[in-house]
Structure formats: structure tokens, C-alpha cells
């Protein structure tokens, strides 16, 4: 696995990633443990009953590319094509409400990328 890989943008945009099974676990947790009436209390005007699901952890696209590169054993170079758009520079979910309700993600990005690659190779 040599050569080079051209990726769009600068690699500087920041994103949040969540393992799919963590998403499913959080969804079930919310359905089984949260009474949305308790979130709005006695005030019928409160409409902020949503709960963001995420890891609350950030990584740059360049960091993710390096993690993937390491997981798959790519020995080549990554080149960033800054003539292509980066998109929104930062996307992070506020998961403070979810954490206060007792749920936290289990799989870190650093562990999930190699696990996903291993699964891919086995299937």
C-alpha cells in the first residue's frame, strides 16, 4: 500500500464521530430511561426537549485520515487539495444533556477505525 492519496480540502475541519452501535445504544437508552415530560417540566411553552446524541469528542479530518492510514497500513503520502472546499470548519454536538441523563459513548474513534477495518477484512 504505497503511492499517494489526494483528499479534498485542508484537513483542518473538525468533526465529531460516533460508533454506530453507540448510536443504537444511546437511542435505546433514551427510549427506555427518559420521560420527555420531565425534560420540559411544568412549563408547556418549553420546546427544548431534544437530546443530541454524539461522542462530544472532536477530531480534524487530517487526524482521521492518519488514523485510517495507520489502520490499513498505507505507507504512501496524503496530499491535501486546498482547491477543493473544506465545508463547515467545525461540527460538534452539545451532548451535555445526554451526559447529565446518564449515557456516554463507549467506543473511541481511535479504537473504532481499526475495529471497522478488521470487520471489513473478515466480511
Where are these regions (language model features)?
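C-terminal substrate-binding subdomain of Rossmann-fold SDR/epimerase-dehydratase oxidoreductases
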Residues: 1-123
Amino acid at each position: 500500500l504505497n503511492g499517494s492519496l489526494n483528499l479534498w480540502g485542508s484537513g483542518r475541519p473538525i468533526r465529531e464521530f460516533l460508533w454506530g452501535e453507540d448510536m443504537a445504544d444511546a437511542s435505546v437508552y433514551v427510549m427506555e430511561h427518559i420521560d420527555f415530560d420531565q425534560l420540559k417540566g411544568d412549563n408547556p411553552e418549553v420546546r427544548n426537549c431534544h437530546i443530541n446524541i454524539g461522542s462530544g469528542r472532536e477530531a480534524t479530518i487530517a487526524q482521521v485520515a492518519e488514523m485510517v492510514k495507520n489502520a490499513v497500513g498505507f505507507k504512501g503520502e496524503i496530499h491535501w487539495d486546498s482547491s477543493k472546499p473544506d465545508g463547515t470548519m467545525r461540527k460538534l454536538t452539545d451532548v451535555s444533556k445526554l451526559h447529565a441523563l446518564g449515557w456516554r459513548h463507549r467506543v473511541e474513534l481511535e479504537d473504532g477505525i481499526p475495529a471497522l477495518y478488521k470487520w471489513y477484512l473478515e466480511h
